[in-house]
UniProtKB/Swiss-Prot annotation:
Protein name: NADH-quinone oxidoreductase subunit H
Principal location class: membrane
Gene Ontology annotations for the cellular component aspect, listed alphabetically: plasma membrane
Topology versus the membrane: Multi-pass membrane protein
Gene from which this protein is expressed: nuoH
Catalytic activity annotation: a quinone + NADH + 5 H(+)(in) = a quinol + NAD(+) + 4 H(+)(out)
Enzyme class: translocase
Alphabetical UniProt keywords: Cell inner membrane, Cell membrane, Membrane, NAD, Quinone, Translocase, Transmembrane, Transmembrane helix, Ubiquinone
InterPro entries the record matches: NADH_UbQ_OxRdtase_su1/FPO, NADH_UbQ_OxRdtase_su1_CS
Protein's organism: Anaplasma phagocytophilum (strain HZ)
Length: 340
């Protein structure tokens, strides 16, 4: 049964990636007073599959200076890690009563006790595929793009880790299912306490996924396409799929940490008749729209501004705010372990 769930999750992520690309092109076209994809299929709905077939049919060009196995291993590693992060994301849940106790049964492949640490570890491992791609391509542009991307991801992982720590402190658990349940039962003052961390997490999401306005690794005027400049055909497609799968993954993490997961946004009885999976997907969709909105409206940062924001603003602020949250929880005797 778990194998069926894994296959269904992989297929769902790949289809979601395909139509996220379609959504991005349509929304950006609307904001720029254009039509966007509208030829292949009704309203252009088959355009993602047309693009996939085009990439499959292209020749895989191997640069003369590339470094053999590493050149082909890099996109596979990046794509595999982008899918692996989804194993611990609870997409919904069913509540059952056993011996008079309400038990939450999440829709998740692996409900790990250390789910937060697992997601952080997967996001950290992704830098290996990127630096390998830049080194193995044998191109200075690709290598510089890879160095930029890796330094950017490492810089913002620090603040993201502190944000996740603050939410875990409030929830008293590192399991993502427990965090969603605890966040749903939290008082409003605790939501306000975590609100600045939500802002830090959203901006860090943009930097972690190399998305606009922090897409410095692929600055066209400087580095052409960045670390994947020498890739073509399905090798390029794997990097492309990995990037968009990561966009959906970090959006799902923000839904789990800050937006109540599969619970409805308002505690109104009639809203609970809508399946939790629908609420979860709706919240992820809203965050993905924000990704596209930012890309269409915000100018690109300079590299020094990006690094200054990560190391001199977000990291100190996140550290101080974790201390503030810990102090407040200590004052109200709500730190993990104090309730007993």
């Amino acid at each position: 049964m778990q194998l069926v769930g894994m296959v269904a999750l992989m297929v769902g992520v790949l289809v979601s990636v395909a139509y996220l690309v379609y959504m991005e092109r349509k929304v950006m076209a609307f904001m720029q007073l254009r039509h966007g994809p509208s030829v292949v299929g009704p309203w252009g709905l088959l355009q993602p599959f047309s693009d996939a077939l085009k990439l499959l049919a292209k020749e895989c060009i191997i640069p003369f200076k590339s470094r053999g196995w590493a050149f082909f291993a890099a996109p596979v590693i990046t794509f595999a890690l982008a899918l692996a992060g989804w194993a611990v994301i609870p997409l919904g849940a069913t509540e059952v009563i056993r011996d008079g106790v309400v038990v939450v049964m999440p829709y998740v492949v692996a409900d790990l006790n250390l789910g937060v640490l697992y997601v952080l570890a997967i996001s950290s491992l992704e830098v290996y595929g990127i630096i390998m791609a830049g080194w193995a391509s044998g191109s200075n542009y690709a290598f510089l793009g890879a160095i930029r991307s890796v330094s950017q991801m490492i810089s913002y992982e620090m603040s993201m880790g502190l944000v996740m720590l603050s939410v875990s402190l409030c929830a008293g658990s590192l399991r993502l299912t427990d965090i969603v349940v605890a966040r749903h039962a939290m008082p409003y003052w605790m939501d306000l306490l975590l609100l600045p961390m939500a802002g830090v997490f959203f901006v860090s999401m943009l930097a972690e996924t190399n998305r606009h306005p922090f897409d410095l690794p692929e600055a066209e005027s400087e580095l052409v396409s960045g670390y994947n400049v020498e890739y073509s055909s399905m090798s390029f497609a794997m990097f492309f799929l990995g990037e968009y799968a990561n966009m959906i993954l970090v959006s799902a993490m923000m839904v789990v940490l800050f937006l109540g997961g599969w619970y409805p946004p308002l505690n109104i009885h009639i809203l609970y008749y809508i399946p939790g999976f629908v609420w979860f997907c709706s919240k992820v969709f809203l965050l993905l729209f924000c990704f596209i909105w930012v890309r269409s409206t915000v100018p690109r940062y300079r590299y020094d501004q990006l690094m200054r924001l990560g190391w001199k603003v977000f990291l100190p602020f996140s550290f101080v705010w974790v201390m503030v949250i810990s102090g407040v929880l200590l004052w109200v005797k709500a730190l993990p372990g104090m309730q007993n």
